[in-house]
């Protein structure tokens, strides 16, 4: 939904559904033998997003979201009796705020320069593996992302975009206890660089999304 004002600014908002999946591998050793674990993650959720843009292309945006995250890992651990896997399911909650500016490059393309801050909280879970209890603590993620994105073919319903961004994770610590004994903390804290290429479908020229 979008509302345009007499001063040339625009406010838009909407509700959304989100879904994603990914795969990963772990590498461990037991009794001088190395073994690989294969994992997968799936999340489903939804939320609400809003954005305000003035006539000069400067905008602010924000969102709230919540959902469920499922994680499955095969061959996660091994002992003399064989290998073991586990499954976890946790709720997640998140929010983000952002600011940016849209710069017109031509009639059919523009440049989006932005900065965004993301906060996500994922609840912990407990599993039993081979009779032993493992407790996974909750995880808090705080990320700052700055980047730029170019969108071309804006005059068409299908436009293309590509961009680069730098991201820094301020938190991301993951703690676990096994039978009451605390394991070493695993952390995602640090810098990363990302690139993106994609397509966007805009059903009408006046659509805000």
Please describe what each predicted stretch is:
Residues 1-209:
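Membrane translocator/pore-forming domains, dominated by Gram-negative outer-membrane beta-barrels
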